[in-house]
Amino acid sequence: MDFATTTEQRDLADAARRHLSERFPPSRLAATADHGLLDPEDWAALDRQGWLDADLGPVDLALLAEESGRALLPQPWVGTAGSALPVYQSAGLPLPGPAALVDSSDTCAAHDTPDWRISGSAPGVVDAHLATELVVAATTRQGVALFGVAPSEISIAERDDIDPLRRYATVRLLHAPARLLADPGRTAELLPALRLRSAMLLACEAVGVADGALAEAVRYAGTRTQFGQPIGSFQAVAHQLAEAYAEIETARSLAYRAAVTLNGDGAAEAVACAAVAGPRAAVLACEVALQVCGGIAMTWEFGLHLRYRRALWLDAHRVTSVPPHDVLAALLLS
């Protein structure tokens, strides 16, 4: 299996890194975390940069997800690109803007001629409060179908969570008007693919979070001196950084493998491996960075806490109700 990226893919990742570092400096991330204000122009800029192009393949998306994690991108791109964009592409419709998938078994749809109406609830929809339209998986008489619902037609209760840059919301629908995006037959193919795609992108995002934390720790270890020399020269520090590096490289290889195999045989196993390794590497790298950076890492201004919060969020988040460890165990033991 060839994991080597093409020149075009490397250029895409480099351009994404430059764009995000210029647009989202630490001071802006801190302000967004404190006040929760997002600039719609940021989403438009991502669109102009090609982050939502229909011709992006899984590897392209994986590289963008990694860069979004490195920069802690405070826009709902991962959720939109992972679990909503393919629905609109399949339906031949333009993406209306940021979108969130409501993947719940507690929603049902009835055909109230000429419209569809949806009722039900979902307790943990990521970035639902930022969506211009929600893609709702709802049960019909013929099976589960996918619908588009305007946020103005439903109740969205945002809730505080460990990561102030990515929040859950409880979504409640009561006879909400909806438009059909995918019938039950198409949905039966789309939903499993959406879940795999979303899990793959989150694993790649976790690699970016981890790599960003390690870079901060290495930079600090090279400039902070103790006993007349950089603290990075001490084995107690160097060994921790090396351990984090090894964990990140393993997670990166598994994430790229998941991207390469996403549309082929073995995708479920590859994605499960990446979903286990990515968040684990992110948590470890952030905890190592906190230890290496010492007291300054505990300050709100330093910003490392935002990386750690995202790592913990990624480690706790589940694309489906089945944890990836259980998915992997079932696949290996079957």
Annotated model-derived regions:
Residues 1-71, 196-334:
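Alpha-helical interface subdomain recognition
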Residues 75-78, 82, 86, 91-215:
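FAD-binding core of flavoproteins
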